Amino acid sequence: LTDRMSVNLELPTADGLKKLAPNKHRKNILTPMRQIQQGIRQGRNEVAIYRHAPDFVPAGQSTQMIVGATPESDYQIMAVAQGLYDNFELKRVFYSAYVSINEDKELPALHTGTPLLREHRLYQADWLMRFYQFRAEELLNEKRPNFNILLDPKCDWALQHLEQFPVEINRADYHTLLRVPGIGVNSARRICGAR
């Protein structure tokens, strides 16, 4: 049957949704997300009690948002994603760079779409939040609201936190190793396991 369910957020903020899709309401998007979350939890409980109970959407739920059609910063976008991961237990947030195809006073001008590199940086930052234990507010903040397009977010974070380096590889805990550019999840596990 269904492996994953997705309710698209469409735009990062309620203001953006109100501006570009006034017939859609944030509550009408978040309510089905909550229902899916509750179904997943109930399914987990049933599997714990009844070994052969069917698993409700085993791959979890996801959502998608268009970035660049409204003026939200990368920080705002990542904070929304963090909130969705924390409060709705989403497995994945997809980001889609806005591509202008129609002229409208509410939309960015034609041929001024969102750079695909921005979308790529959002995906990289999302990966850091899901697998490297970063929080949105560690990567960006209101004073520094957008990613450096020229650097991947983990390297950019390291340059902003030079006081945490160098790291003694033989003594650093797993969490610290995850923050070292060039060390991934598997390498951090191997380093900790080899001690």
State the predicted function of each range.
Residues 1-139:
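Conserved AdoMet/S-adenosylmethionine-binding subsite of the radical SAM
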Residues 108-179, 188:
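Long, highly charged, low-complexity intrinsically disordered interaction regions
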Residues 194-195:
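Residue-level signature of tetratricopeptide-repeat
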